[in-house]
């Protein structure tokens, strides 16, 4: 059911039909399938179906309870930004931590950022570096960039204050 929904949502090998994909994802989510819930949340968050971030967040919360790393990561992102509900850095960090413990590359990168800045919990540079290294080893480009910035902490900005490059010793 979820697989067909993905094909319909993306138009991969079949005519694109987001409305039918949504129905399939809804049935899967209602049956307790975490992938159905995360895919439905992606559509509800604005990925082609009517945008409903409150519903997306509720669906992700339900899927996150099944220990779905992807749902925990997506819910963490929404919680960190206050999309579909209140912003809560402590709760977001907890969600990222749960997904990172399962090896989710995006969650590992976010844990690195949260640990580096002290957002939602204690600041810990060595933990941040460890999270970034794990995420980078899994191919996360943001983590690779964060590690590079740590090696080259001096920044060049243009006249508008936009990042141009890092300087290294």
Q: What residue spans do the PLM features occupy?
A:
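Terminal, low-structured helical/coil segments at or just beyond the last alpha-helical repeat
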Residues: 134-169
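Recognition helices and adjacent regulatory flanks at domain boundaries
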Residues: 33, 58, 130, 137-138
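Structural signature of tandem alpha-helical TPR/SEL1-like repeats
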Residues: 15-27, 48-59, 86-95, 122-131, ...
């Amino acid at each position: 059911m979820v697989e067909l929904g993905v094909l319909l949502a993306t138009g991969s090998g079949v005519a694109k039909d987001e409305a039918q994909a949504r129905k399939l994802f809804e049935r899967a989510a209602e049956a307790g399938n975490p992938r159905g819930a995360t895919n439905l949340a992606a559509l509800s968050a604005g990925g082609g179906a009517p945008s409903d971030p409150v519903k997306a967040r509720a669906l992700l919360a339900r899927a996150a309870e099944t220990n779905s790393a992807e749902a925990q990561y997506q819910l963490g992102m929404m919680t960190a930004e206050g999309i579909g509900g209140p912003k809560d850095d402590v709760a977001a960090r907890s969600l990222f931590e749960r997904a990172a413990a399962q090896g989710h590359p995006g969650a590992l990168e976010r844990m690195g950022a949260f640990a580096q800045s002290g957002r939602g919990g204690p600041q810990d540079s060595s933990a941040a570096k460890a999270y970034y290294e794990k995420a980078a080893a899994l191919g996360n480009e943001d983590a690779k960039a964060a590690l590079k910035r740590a090696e080259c902490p001096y920044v060049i900005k243009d006249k508008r204050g936009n990042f141009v490059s890092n300087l290294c010793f």
